[in-house]
Amino acid sequence: MDMSQLMFRDGLMDGERVLVTGGGTGLGKEMAEGFLKLGAEVHICGRRGGVCEETAEALMSAHGGKVVAHGCDIRVAEAINDMTDQIWMNHGPLTGLVNNAAGNFISRTEDLSIRG
């Protein structure tokens, strides 16, 4: 993705801190890259922490900026709390969230538990 593919001005997200769940691959990775190019500090998380680490390194190598990887299973409430506490303490408050992580659960929404 190059800047000509983005419809927003350079630096639009300078000073912002965004968390993208499921940010190691696919659409989450693409959105994380877009936020990074617009100037945001980007945090990505996913169950496969190693994949997130590789993505963070690749994005920073390609575009500079700051991408922080977190291994986190969002189905575990305590893991989410630990991750967001760590972000807050080490980096400051989040200013944006893309809840991209997904699962394929064939069920009525009201029948789903917090764990899917």
Question: Predicted regions span which residues?
Answer:
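Rossmann-fold scaffold of SDR-type NAD(P)-dependent oxidoreductases
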Residues: 21-22, 94-102
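Conserved glycine-rich cofactor-binding loop
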Residues: 17, 22-26, 48
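NAD(P)H-binding Rossmann-fold N-terminus in SDR/SDR-like oxidoreductases
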Residues: 26, 30, 104
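Aromatic pocket-lining residues of Rossmann-like dinucleotide-binding sites
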Residues: 35
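Conserved amphipathic alpha-helix within the SDR
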Residues: 57-60, 67-71, 76-92
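Conserved mid-core segment of classical short-chain dehydrogenase/reductases
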Residues: 81, 104-116
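Flexible N-terminal pre-Rossmann segment of NAD(P)-dependent oxidoreductases
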Residues: 1-19
